[in-house]
């Protein structure tokens, strides 16, 4: 194998974390910075009880989410008018350019998710949407849910 040949990379758990523009802490996984990825990133996210992200979208990049554990409310679409309740084991696909905002639906349990994006520089395509953060229907989530 030559010096320029692609090779596998291992990124050890606990390698580090960073504060995302979305207002949450991400645990570093696969990205351009950690593994030389060219077309994807893959991270672990833990949302504390009652925590939420800032309203945002990912310009030109798709996202896939697997909720490992917990319960989350996801607001999405134009004006964040669409809503789904997510449970551990659920998968979510988010097309590029779709506004979204996840909320941990539990007051006592964290929500943990694996997130993959078609952007190896994960934070570069994040576009914050502060005008959506204070929408009236977001101030009172549709019921709280405890995980068990």
Protein language model features and the residues they cover:
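A short, N-terminal "cap"/entry segment at the start of jelly-roll beta-barrel domains
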Residues: 1-39, 54-55, 128-148
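Histidine-centered divalent metal-coordination motifs
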Residues: 56-58, 100
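Ligand-binding loop in jelly-roll beta-barrel domains
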Residues: 83, 87-88, 96-124
């Amino acid at each position: 194998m030559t010096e320029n040949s692609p090779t596998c990379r291992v990124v050890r758990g606990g390698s580090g974390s960073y504060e995302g523009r979305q207002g949450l802490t991400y645990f570093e996984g696969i990205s351009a910075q950690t593994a030389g990825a060219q077309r994807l990133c893959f991270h672990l996210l833990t949302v504390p009880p009652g925590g939420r992200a800032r309203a945002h979208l990912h310009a030109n990049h798709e996202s896939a989410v697997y909720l490992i554990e917990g319960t989350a409310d996801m607001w999405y679409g134009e004006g964040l008018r669409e809503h789904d309740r997510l449970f551990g084991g659920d998968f979510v696909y988010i097309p590029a350019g779709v506004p979204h905002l996840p909320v941990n639906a539990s007051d006592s349990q964290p929500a943990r998710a694996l997130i993959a994006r078609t952007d190896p520089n994960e934070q570069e395509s994040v576009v914050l949407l502060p005008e959506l953060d204070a929408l009236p229907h977001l101030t009172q989530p549709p019921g709280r849910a405890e995980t068990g």
